[in-house]
């Protein structure tokens, strides 16, 4: 009989989201073979949580699709990366995306209502909470998309650009996370908030207010460049900015959307060592 170590139990928990005792039992029955344990747990329906609907769904997939001059991007969440790779979960996400594209739907509540029965059935089958989180669309003369695995998806709309350039720009957005297209697009409230932060920092250094304000002006120009697409160094050629690249191609970016799985969702972190200690006291 193979030794069932705590690290093996932890790995199975992370991959399946199942409880510690369920994982230990499955590993014991599979003689320490983690892949066989997962297969057996799937067959028995053991990969589940007691209250699925209340569990935090912070894993999942991003899906993108271009249809003519409109592109769509969708996020569907589950609880673990194990289920995110499940064929049934992937098929569900694809079906939701196809419906969004066919109906030009950008209201996530409409999609949720349309697929609620299928979602509930899939939750019962897979054993994890599933949530259609958000959907968005982008129109443009030239559209491009990029997916970094299944966790990051980007849409870019441009004028005067070819498909290869738009693809490269989408890859840049995935890597560099700009929030705006151009420095002048940075919203007034974002600028004001950052200005006050930088002014406080400058004043705390003991500089007179007039000098501090001049220092902050320079910092703000740098800040708006850092958070805007055209102001960032191009990831494939850092010696030039994205703005310079676009100028060379006589092209413009009219918009972009970047989704990353689980961004903004607070995941519940379990203290595995504490849980093991608690279970030991009970036995």
Swiss-Prot record:
This is Elongation factor Ts. It is found in: Cytoplasm. The gene is tsf. It comes from the Bacteria. NCBIfam families: tsf. Belongs to the EF-Ts family. It holds the Pfam family EF_TS. CDD domains: UBA_EF-Ts. The lineage of its organism: Bacteria, Pseudomonadati, Pseudomonadota, Gammaproteobacteria, Enterobacterales. Residues 80-83 are annotated as: Involved in Mg(2+) ion dislocation from EF-Tu. Keywords: Cytoplasm, Elongation factor, Protein biosynthesis. GO terms for cellular component: cytoplasm. Its main location: cytoplasm. Signal peptide: none annotated. One of its GO terms (molecular function) is translation elongation factor activity. Associates with the EF-Tu.GDP complex and induces the exchange of GDP to GTP. It remains bound to the aminoacyl-tRNA.EF-Tu.GTP complex up to the GTP hydrolysis stage on the ribosome.
